[in-house]
A protein has these predicted regions:
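Active-site rim elements
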Residues: 253-263
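Sequence/structural segment immediately N-terminal to covalent heme-attachment motifs in c-type
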Residues: 64-100, 183-220, 238
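Gly/Gly-Pro-rich "capping" loops immediately C-terminal to redox-active cysteine motifs
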Residues: 1-9, 84-132, 210-246
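Flexible coil segments in periplasmic/lumen-exposed cytochrome c-class electron-transfer proteins
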Residues: 2-66, 70, 90-91, 116-123, ...
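Generic structural signal for alpha-helix termini and adjacent loop/cap motifs
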Residues: 21-25, 78-82, 139, 163-166, ...
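Conserved helix-loop functional segments at active or binding sites
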Residues: 169, 205-209, 251
Length: 302
């Protein structure tokens, strides 16, 4: 989903007209002239200033390998459905990489492939993008790795490469990762339990089980239990999870593009991350191989 400022007046008018005439709505159509006048009166992005640019996903259709890139995007959005033999829980890539990896501070894919191969402290060696993706399959999705040369792995890499655009290895990409949170804060899991009940349970369930629709399909992912990420996942670390929560959760309560995400204080984010990251979840047997050379982070679960 592109940033609001990237859309033409005509495109915004078409979107608004569609919404106003769909799902039982009976509003009149909006034309480009009306949008132009309104844009002159308001700042398109009057939230926090950022140089992060969300790619226009429709543009991938012009890529010479468009079919492969689209397959890669679908694999990130529908991972469990398309790769059931490799996903061992109820998560998809987009559970952590929001909006198919297009959200600033939501672990976006924008520019990422330019930085691989790179040294990974947890692995203690230089790894390629395929190995990094398989780390997510084994940890965040508690599943099995894809063969690096398989068509599906190469489709996922192709999607990353398309998202790279003109990024160079030496560049700094705004919005990369999950943002920052004050690392000096002391977690209070009891307050975290209260924050979870107040801000998170409505989507992720009172017992962290996630939320399904009437057809049994998972709408919001489970945060603990057998169907969630294992202890080897980055999201099982308090301060990694806290930074993600701080910048991306809850959704729908703010004006931040594109999901209305964020709003918790640093302390509440740290507390709720401490609470849910330490709930029961699957083990990761290969944890004994992690950080063979570098210092283990203090918030690691093992």
């Amino acid at each position: 989903m592109p940033g609001f400022a990237q859309l033409e007046d005509r495109e915004i008018a078409e979107i608004l007209s569609f919404v106003r005439s769909s799902w039982g709505n009976q509003g009149s159509s909006i034309d480009a002239g009306q949008v132009k006048k309104l844009r002159q009166r308001i700042e398109a992005g009057n939230g926090p200033a950022t140089t992060f640019v969300s790619p226009r996903l429709a543009d991938m259709l012009a890529a010479p390998n468009a079919e492969q890139v689209v397959r890669g995007m679908r694999l990130h959005l529908e991972t469990r459905e398309l790769l059931p033999a490799n996903v061992g829980n109820q998560l998809n890539c987009t559970s952590c990489h929001l909006n198919a990896g297009t959200v600033a501070d939501g672990s976006p894919f924008v520019g990422v492939s330019a930085f691989f191969p790179s040294y990974a402290p947890r692995a203690g060696k230089v790894i390629g993008l395929e190995e990094r993706i398989n780390g997510c399959f084994r940890r965040s999705m508690n599943g099995k790795p894809l063969p690096p040369d398989s068509a599906d792995m190469q489709a996922m890499v192709a999607y990353f490469d398309w998202m790279k655009n003109n990024t160079r290895p030496q560049d700094k990409v705004a919005g990369r990762g999950v943002g920052k949170v004050d690392p000096a804060l002391k977690p209070d899991p009891e307050n975290g339990r209260k924050v979870y009940a107040r801000q998170c349970a409505v989507c992720h369930g009172e017992n962290g089980e996630g939320l399904r629709n009437s057809a049994g399909e998972m709408l919001f992912p489970p945060l603990w239990g057998d169907e969630s990420f294992n202890i080897g996942a980055g999201m099982a670390r308090t301060f990694t999870a806290a930074a993600f929560v701080k910048h991306n959760m809850p959704i729908g309560f703010q004006e931040r593009f594109p999901l209305g995400q964020g709003g918790l204080s640093d302390q509440d984010a740290v507390d709720v991350a401490e609470y849910f990251s330490h709930q029961p979840r699957p083990d990761f047997p290969d944890k004994i191989k992690d950080w063979p050379k570098d210092k283990r982070p203090l918030d690691a679960r093992y």
